[in-house]
Amino acid sequence: MGPAEAGRRGAASPVPPPLVRVAPSLFLGSARAAGAEEQLARAGVTLCVNVSRQQPGPRAPGVAELRVPVFDDPAEDLLAHLEPTCAAMEAAVRAGGACLVYCKNGRSRSAAVCTAYLMRHRGLSLAKAFQMVKSARPVAEPNPGFWSQLQKYEEALQAQSCLQGEPPALGLGPEA
């Protein structure tokens, strides 16, 4: 389903909840979720990944923020941020916390980062990782530029699996 169909479908269906559970310790949502202190506490969220340049950070005490400063624009370089962002998310999970990844609408940027995390730290293919994200949040639809970058990230992760302990060569620009 393309962005146009998703938009029409989203208009006909109720507004999605501010945050949804994608996997154990991984939540995806809109900017409203960062302000939902009770829900963040119930979910055990200790790290909010704010995938935006303009949305406010979390207001809940004890919740750290990692800002990934990108607009929802296919030309934005999200790929350069994926490896450090996924590493920070995994560190929060290993420390016993949970992560909320959000952007303005919880649709493109945050869905792309959740998909990348599932690929990097759960060993899923791009197709399987995105299926998990889409099942949890049906409005999820990374823009075409982010989807292309997720494909490059998957290729880098596949190449890395042959070289144990080597991080993928990322962040070298759009050609990476």
From Swiss-Prot:
Protein's UniProt name: Dual specificity phosphatase 28
PANTHER family in UniProt: DUAL SPECIFICITY PHOSPHATASE 28, IP21249P
Pfam families named in the record: DSPc
Subunit-structure text: Monomer.
EC number per UniProt: 3.1.3.16, 3.1.3.48
Active-site residues, as the UniProt record annotates them: C103
Effect upon mutating Y102H: Decreases the already low catalytic activity
